[in-house]
């Protein structure tokens, strides 16, 4: 085990005592109370992990002392020797739990997310695959108790989506979906293929943390807002009022378009929310890319041009190329049932990279 500096743990315990005292004396103003309460809530979990780790450490030290004691009672030494493996395992688990809780936190992990799926190479088959991916994430979200709301969609001519953008609302959505960003590839025999040949097509997925107004400031003077009539598949107008909204952020060139609601006011609110999320994500991506380059991270780099996963239908196989994980559970993954197996493996690898970067591996 890589030692965790005791002075670092002592500093956390001291800070916990200070925050507790500041909240107890009642002198803090309302704003400070909110911040201190949030900090205390975060520190409580860390302090519990520290106490658990130190208790396990002391327990193992006591057992080792009993075994090594010259002239000690043979029966007690034998009993201690029996207890030693279990105590070592308990310390290992407490050490691992403490390491993970000390890792730098991604402030966006607790947020809801914006999910964008776009058909890539492969024509109609790519659009169908984009639709399959959207259903996979929708089913996964349902299993987690999250809510999915489509912001904008452009249907493919043979079904599926050329593009679909949705909000996924719930606690810690981004922490689970953020590793899905990238290029997804499918290998299967299309229904229209008479020779039984396998075709390859692709779709790209982008997952953004849903930004709130406090996360990023958007200057109204930097916006170009256009209204227009909503359009359906094929480009025809589907209503007579100009309810669709397109907002262009002039400094960055970021454009968002929303037409799902009949109300222009609601579409504008959704478009602003989507724009904030895109601008917030651009800031995060720049910072994350620099950090990822420093540690040569394979997981969580956020590179959306990277081919991250292949879905091979003839073999019933899903392969995540970042961690060389292969599951022969294609149907279960596409149904959202086994997606956690992939995501859990990605989270574990990401944590290992962070531990190495922090010198705690």
From Swiss-Prot:
Entry keyword GTP-binding: no
SUPFAM superfamilies linked to this entry: Release factor
Gene3D superfamilies: 3.30.160.20, 3.30.70.1660, 6.10.140.1950
Record's keyword terms, sorted: Cytoplasm, Methylation, Protein biosynthesis
Localization (cell): Cytoplasm
Modification after translation, per record: Methylated by PrmC. Methylation increases the termination efficiency of RF1.
Domain of life: Bacteria
Region (Disordered): 285-311
Biased amino acid composition, Basic and acidic residues: 285-309
GO MF entries: translation release factor activity, codon specific
GO CC annotation terms, alphabetical: cytoplasm
Residues carrying N5-methylglutamine: 236
Entry function: Peptide chain release factor 1 directs the termination of translation in response to the peptide chain termination codons UAG and UAA.
Homology family: Belongs to the prokaryotic/mitochondrial release factor family.
Name of this protein: Peptide chain release factor 1
Provenance organism: Methylorubrum extorquens (strain PA1) (Methylobacterium extorquens)
Gene: prfA
